[in-house]
Amino acid sequence: HRSIRRQRQMCIRDRFSPGPITYVLKLKKNSKISKFVTNNKNTVAIRFPKHKLLRKLLKVLSYPLAAPSANISSKLSSVQPSDVKEEFGRKLKYILKGGRCSIGVESTIINLADNPSILRLGGLSVSKIKKIIKKQILIKNKSKNKISPGLFSLHYSPGIPLRMNVKKPNEGEAFVLIKKRKINSKNYFFLSKNNNLIKAARNLYPLIRKIKNKGYKKIAVEKIPNIGIGQTINDRLERASKY
């Protein structure tokens, strides 16, 4: 059983890392990893980032890097240096400027400590993982047992009301559409030019942040196809809608 689990872990790691995936693994009994990193749990989350600048930083360090997300708890994620500066202001002395995130949403978190399960939908679609391990994967991103961050019902929120699956916006709402259309209204915003879900995911947080900074008090979003990375977009919108 352990050898099968080990083979599965190696297979997924070799195929998808470095990339937008985080692995939750069981700790060894004699592990020297700090309890402050594991939150006193018997598991640890491991990530192999793909960005060249961050990989260069990791090579310079003589130890693994433990770091929280670049956003305040429950708030919108930061996907570019200006977002980080906006969120944290003078609390940060330095910002490692690597440009805008290429994917735009957080990593997929997969629990490999037991039978494979998705703890958080993210930048790597579940369908791609299924093709590699050829096994059914449970999606537990709404589980009450939150062994992973980013799973609270209210999360990734712009701090203003947001509605999903909207056909027609109310007066004064910013209306977010998946595909660009010829509409003569300043209240309409577009996630992509041609219904591209990958680009929509990349533009999601910057567009919502832009809308909020323009002074809108409410956001309405049309129905997003719930396939591929569209599942992740809908997950983030659903959590943001709990405000």
Tell where the protein language model's regions lie, with residue ranges.
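Active-site-adjacent structural elements in enzyme catalytic cores
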Residues: 6-9, 13-243
